[in-house]
A protein has these predicted regions:
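Acetyl-CoA-dependent GNAT
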Residues: 8-14, 19-78, 102, 108, ...
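Conserved N-terminal entry element of GNAT/NAT acetyltransferase domains
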Residues: 1-12, 154-160
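Conserved acetyl-CoA binding element of GNAT-fold acetyltransferases
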Residues: 79-90
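Conserved active-site alpha-helix within GNAT-family acetyltransferase domains
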Residues: 99, 123-142
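Conserved GNAT acetyl-CoA-binding A-motif
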Residues: 110-120
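Active-site acidic-Proline motif in GNAT/NAT acetyltransferases
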Residues: 89-91, 95, 123-124
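Conserved acetyl-CoA pyrophosphate-binding loop and the N-cap/start of the following alpha-helix
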Residues: 92, 96-104
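Conserved beta-strand-loop-alpha-helix junction that forms the acyl-donor binding cleft
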Residues: 119-128, 147-150
Length: 160
């Protein structure tokens, strides 16, 4: 009989977190953008507590993960839960593990009095888009994400 659990990442699992980040990046065709290191993730997740990770396990084998943190909505007047990464191994998709991870985070968001949960999805990722819509998530078509990379941050911060 298969057992399925969702649990928080342990302090000695930064390497596993990085492994799953790299698997997600490969799936998203963005592997060349991964700069994270095991040491940096350990510091961010388990020392400074800047984000959290939960793993989905099937019979004690990790089959998926979610990395998330809190943001804040001035419109709602409360914090939110921001899902940075969600990934389930390709051979384990369609078994409900992604939905279980999202449901776990939704319950956590409610327990923590969050006003909403948000994430982004690549516009070509139709399987994920369809999945998110199936659980009632709504795309924010009127919004555009802007980003300053570290280099651009430096140029802007030090510029005139």
């Amino acid at each position: 009989m298969t057992t399925f659990t969702i649990r928080a990442a342990k302090e000695n699992e930064a390497a596993t977190v990085l492994e799953f980040i790299k698997k997600l990046a490969e799936y998203e065709k963005l592997a060349h953008e991964v700069e994270a290191s095991e040491e940096g993730l350990h510091e961010a997740l388990f020392v400074r507590h800047e984000a959290e990770v939960v793993f989905a396990e099937e019979d004690d084998a990790i089959v998926g993960f979610a990395l998330f943190f809190h943001n804040f909505s001035t419109f709602v007047g409360r914090k939110g839960l921001y899902l940075e990464d969600l990934f389930v191994l390709p051979e384990k998709r369609g078994l409900g593990y992604g939905k279980a991870l999202l449901k776990h985070l939704a319950k956590l968001a409610l327990e923590r009095h969050c006003g909403r949960m948000e994430w982004v999805c690549l516009d070509w990722n139709q399987p994920s888009i369809d999945f998110y819509k199936s659980i009632g998530a709504v795309p924010m078509a009127d919004w555009t994400i802007y980003r300053l990379t570290e280099e651009k941050l430096r140029v802007f911060a030090e510029g005139v």
